Amino acid sequence: MAGNEWINGYLEAILDTGASAIDENSGGGKTAAAQKGRHHDHHFNPTKYFVEEVVSGVDESDLHRTWIKVVATRNTRERSSRLENMCWRIWHLTRKKKQLEWEDLQRLAARKWEREQGRKDVTEDMSEDLSEGEKGDVMGETPVALDSPRGNKKYHRNFSNLEVWSDSNKEKKLYIVLISLHGLVRGENMELGRDSDTGGQIKYVVEVARALAKMPGVYRVDLFTRQISSPEVDWSYAEPTEMLSSSSTTAGEAHEPEEEEEEEDLGEGSGAYIIRIPFGPRDKYLRKELLWPHIQEFVDGALSHIVNMSKALGDQIGGGQPVWPYVIHGHYADAGDSAALLSGALNVPMVLTGHSLGRNKLEQLLKQGRQTKEDINSMYRIMRRIEAEELSLDAAELVITSTKQEIEEQWGLYDGFDVKLERVLRARARRGVNCHGRFMPRMAVIPPGMDFSNVVVPEDGSEGDGDLATLTEATSPRSVPAIWADVMRFLTNPHKPMILALSRPDPKKNITTLVKAFGECRPLRELANLTLIMGNRDDIDEMSGGNASVLTTVLKLIDRYDLYGQVAFPKHHKQSDVPEIYRLASKTKGVFINPAFIEPFGLTLIEAAAHGLPMVATKNGGPVDIHRALNNGLLVDPHDQDAIANALLKLVSEKNLWNECRKNGLKNIHLFSWPEHCRTYLTRVAACRMRHPQWKTDTPLDETAIDDSLNDSLKDVLDMSLRLSVDGEKMSVNESSSVELPGGEAAELPDQVRRVLNKIKRQDSGPAQREAEGKAGDVPGKYPMLRRRRKLFVIALDCYDLKGNPDKKMILSIQEIVRAVRLDPQMSRFSGFALSTAMPVAELADFLKAGDVKVNDFDALICSSGSEVYYPGTYGEESGKLYLDPDYTSHIEYRWGGDGLKKTISKLMNTAEDGKSSVASSPIELVAKSSNSHCLSYAIKDPSKAKKVDDMRQKLRMRGLRCHLMYCRNSTSMQVVPLLASRSQALRYLFVRWRLSVANMYVILGETGDTDYEELISGTHKTLIMRGVVEKGSEELLRTAGSYLRDDVIPQDTPLIAYADKGAKAEHIVETFRQLSKAGM
């Protein structure tokens, strides 16, 4: 470098603006961490800007020469000393940036090695039946194009195995669920650009809901989002339900008359709706990074709505049987996490659209070298977001992307998706070859659609110059759109071609480079105006730090280049103004530009093309595919401002090129219509493995069912005497179940009770009958007492000794909890009890028997970490017979690869950390008696060698294996159950199956427990944490360093969680239950 005067200038500028802002963490240390839970500073920080320019733009030798010069010329003045000191401090930042870059390279290399090791293991496992054709699939590259069943050949994909969705499906009457949690979602007057959470995704999900509801065969679409009752936002966001009014008929897609008549004949529940579910603080509008601890609360609220809606739709169109969702579609990571849990609870297919991805954002932020991984996680909760995306990949049947680049360069970064492995598994599945329990979601490129109803484009695209002048002069001022006046008031000559940019003032949208390109190109300034639509604002100082910084920089650049009269930047616009803005740019023969560093898709490019505007767009991301389809503009490097200026100048100066791009865009825009999008979407969804609950919800009306229903009534009577007595006596949970009925009162008993007593007197309890009752599918198993319960107390205390054996303290706690419930007559009415444990059912039964507690005292037993659900028989059965729920077994079957998991887990546990050598002795051993068809139970022989859950889950995902792995029983056991099975999910199953509301469940836990402990805390149920009952858990084996935190899973300061002191008696426990019961009101 010839001279270092520019470095000196930067250093002098830093001194002038306040060098105190520099510290060792300016490149990404405490500055970011101090902002935890907040947005960036509200004011532009020039010191930070100059420091980043020096740190990023020079090497150490330049800094060293500058320091030598400062030392040589220093004097006694304080400024010289400060300048010398600052050289040292910035040099330290430069070294730190290089260290972060080195650590990033090491991390990427480790991930690459682990990925290759996973592929190697998969190849070895499947080598015995891997064909040459499949090997070709691994090595080859299969091109991916835009999915469009009716597109032209250039963008047509092979749909030979798929039946294209058409009017022949109009009799299906489907119920579709969409989820988009963050931001401000409403159907009209969307506040797009208000904040970083309310952007293009909000518009997309609302429009896709409307469009799907108009497709043949779709009866109802529910778009779930968060209900916000905060004074910070409009009252409309607190409305629980909003019907999405139908847009006017889409251009080029007019309905036939018979279709309109058919729409009128649909039931009252048909159409598209926004359903707002309250979760998290009711009076606060939370940014998306703060929603994570409340996800399970949303899931429970959404589950309640879906169950009720399915029943209502069943009455309307399902012949009395519930109409379950055809698909549950999550948008973004938070909704993907929710959709995965809902999919598991309902056993219906899940679809995912990422919109933007956490790993991609993490990689970009780390490459900048300004923040450490810990600081990034603190600000963006990025690790929690990434785990949600990984879970979404685990559960999703189908992942919708906008571009091919998103599949290969973004989803390819995830443990749960490998492009090469997906091709192999798809080929094997197509040929009927065993995949050894491995699964990969299918990826489909389906570009977003657009509503053309507000687009008015003249058929003749050859308007001459002066169209805008003609239009504005020939009409009265009142007929000119107000937004036109707002824009034109900035411009000295508003008739020049308009260069239009429309985006949030987000740093990644690269607006400042566009302004520099415009300001430094005099021919472009002479030919065109620049219009910047940068969201809505009242006061820059009240905006988030990043947005405020961009706007401040834009204003300074306008002043630097003296662009007054050439740049328009209105403060406000409505969503309904956007078409008029495009139309204004088109009338002036302008150009639309999207200069973002990376654009996941670029919906505004499609909108602009539909209004006849050629485009200049970034070459990174979705615009590449849009340009390939429309061929209506130029692609540029967003970092090259000269290339941006030249592309804009070329389009506005060459009229023939402008007209050609305009015509191409209008000719091909139909590829991005909503009907086309929805047709392709439904075609893809129809190819998913359809699954839904298999049971029938109505009780058979034959005599046997009636009699068994009366048995349930008898059990009610017995329950009230046995364990819900309120006579004040200290009855234990295992007291006699005999009932004495005074003869004098027999005549006054209700008819149903008398029928029950007559039935029980004539009941034959012989061996043959007992044998019949033990069969799976008997009525006691089908219709247990849970259907009559209004409250359920779920005891999930993980009390074990150091050897992993159940502790007797569990028995004492059970008895004290039951006694506490009996102390409150109101609470005890129609209340039941359930046990939730890692123990297998046989061990649990023996343990209860040893403690003199009958299994009949419980309505349900959730065993083996949620892999099995049992119901006890009636109280007349002294043998304590238990009935396995066969429906639950099929409910959790999804993506369970038992044999493949068994082989891979053994291999992983017997491999040293370097991945090359084998350990001397295996740290685990499969325990057959504790395992079942959906649970692999391992004894941990050496806990110090056990790999943490995060680490094991990553390795299994990289090998295409999906499961729920946990350590339990004081880290002495590891259990592997199906992906969507868990003790927490089993509670949601009980709600779906027996209509026992999760909000009426009370979950009793210790202060710690198995590694699935955190899952049991969150939700709409009430949680009682008993101190001092569980001394040691397994949570130290849950997370690796650098993973998400407990606070990202469990909500803080919630009224739904209460504590009982160590050694608490029934009187204190019941008082805590009373407080919790008020929290749900």
From Swiss-Prot:
Residues 256-267 have a biased composition (Acidic residues). It catalyses: beta-D-fructose 6-phosphate + UDP-alpha-D-glucose = sucrose 6(F)-phosphate + UDP + H(+). Its EC number is 2.4.1.14. The keyword Transport does not apply. One of its GO terms (biological process) is sucrose biosynthetic process. Keywords: Glycosyltransferase, Transferase. This is Probable sucrose-phosphate synthase 2. It comes from Craterostigma plantagineum. The gene is SPS2.
